[in-house]
């Protein structure tokens, strides 16, 4: 069984990004909204499958905390407090970016927003964030310095990203675009 904790739908041009958060069995977007599914263009079938897909999963790889129970994870939410953003990796920097971020997660000491999640598909990164931010790390050891963060900062993080046009850029970096939230729970 699963329990849906939150859902948010974000848009960038003709692309939709659906963030689902649950405890228990993972949720799949197919069938959650048949009306929306009917509007989506089909993607080619995955290897080993016969039918085209309406949704393509992104792989989560970077986070600061892991939900264990709904009670542990639930909190007061505010409409408009959920944010989506995208970034595009330069093709020759994909492996480096992934290597450093997987090291940060494995180390578990980098403090960040409890509900921040980054997923990847090809060279596209999608981030989910919430306000107000609640800073934690995976090990739940606040204040312990991250050696992996120092290594990541030493390789010029900004060099890993394509930059968006000035009018698209997020408030904190030229390599992020904040996406409008179209729909979701907690409206």
Task: Give residue spans per PLM region.
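Short amphipathic alpha-helical segments
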Residues: 1-4, 93-114
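An amphipathic, aromatic/His-enriched active-site/gating alpha helix that lines ligand/cofactor pockets
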Residues: 2-5, 22-56, 111-113, 132-176
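Short beta-strand
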Residues: 7-12, 116-121
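Short beta-strand-to-loop capping motifs
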Residues: 19-24, 87-91, 128-133
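Surface-exposed beta-loop interaction hotspot
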Residues: 50-88
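Acidic/histidine-enriched, glycine/proline-rich intrinsically disordered or flexible terminal extensions
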Residues: 65-73, 163-187
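A contiguous pocket-lining binding segment that forms or flanks enzyme active sites
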Residues: 113-116, 128
């Amino acid at each position: 069984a699963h329990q849906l904790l939150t859902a948010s739908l974000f848009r960038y041009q003709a692309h939709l990004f659906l963030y689902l958060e649950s405890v228990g069995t993972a949720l799949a977007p197919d069938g959650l909204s048949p009306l929306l599914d009917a509007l989506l263009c089909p993607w080619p079938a995955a290897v080993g499958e016969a039918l085209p897909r309406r949704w393509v999963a992104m792989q989560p790889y970077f986070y600061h905390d892991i939900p264990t129970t709904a009670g542990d994870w639930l909190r007061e939410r505010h409409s408009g407090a959920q944010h989506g953003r995208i970034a595009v990796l330069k093709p020759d920097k994909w492996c480096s970016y992934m290597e450093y971020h997987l090291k940060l997660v494995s180390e578990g000491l980098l403090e960040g927003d409890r509900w921040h999640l980054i997923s990847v598909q090809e060279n596209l990164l999608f981030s989910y964030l919430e306000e107000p931010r609640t800073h934690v790390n995976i090990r739940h050891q606040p204040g312990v310095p991250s050696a992996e963060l120092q290594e990541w900062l030493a390789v010029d993080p900004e060099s890993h990203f394509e930059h968006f046009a000035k009018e698209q850029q997020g408030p904190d970096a030229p390599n992020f675009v904040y996406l409008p939230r179209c729909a979701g729970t907690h409206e």
